[in-house]
């Protein structure tokens, strides 16, 4: 029986941070560069609002408006490089599930996006949403689902996994990843994730 790996969606599979930047530029009329959306911070929640305030556009942008647009159409959100290829490779050795803390109202649009970008029928689960404060933590959900490892960009979720006896990979290089998570592995991109798992099996 294959071991189960849980994978986050936003900024792990889907380039949501980049979609947010481009949306913000379009709405505000201010051309912020990718590096301006990668600001060191110890707090994930409120990250975008702090960036907008720093550049004086907080009165023109609202995360809830961006999220509302995603309910019906997520086509502007790109697939991160090598995500589909590496996940397909991992599926040969592991049972892959997706665990997201997205607002549940995004479920239908999320399923459409996943079907367009990933191969196979991968189970999708919704964990606690930080803005709504409802549901189980990712660590609790991963433990309940029998996942031995979580791949996530959010250090809080990785800490939650470890607290529940689930291994964690902190994915990507984002400004909100300043906090240290003891016992977590850091992988900057999907090729690094594949390299890590290849090394585990040797």
Task: Kindly label every feature range from the protein language model.
Residues 44-85:
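Metal-dependent phosphoesterase signature
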Residues 74-79, 83-113, 125-127:
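Substrate-recognition element of Asp-dependent hydrolases with the DxDx(T/V) motif
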Residues 101-151, 155-159:
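Substrate-recognition "cap/lid" segment bordering the active-site pocket of phosphatases
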Residues 14-17, 21-22, 105-109, 133, ...:
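Short catalytic/ligand-binding loop motif for oxyanion handling, primarily in non-cytosolic enzymes
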Residues 147-188:
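Acidic, Mg2+-coordinating phosphoryl-transfer loop and its flanking beta/alpha structural elements
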Residues 1-61:
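Active-site neighborhood of HAD-like aspartate-dependent phosphohydrolases
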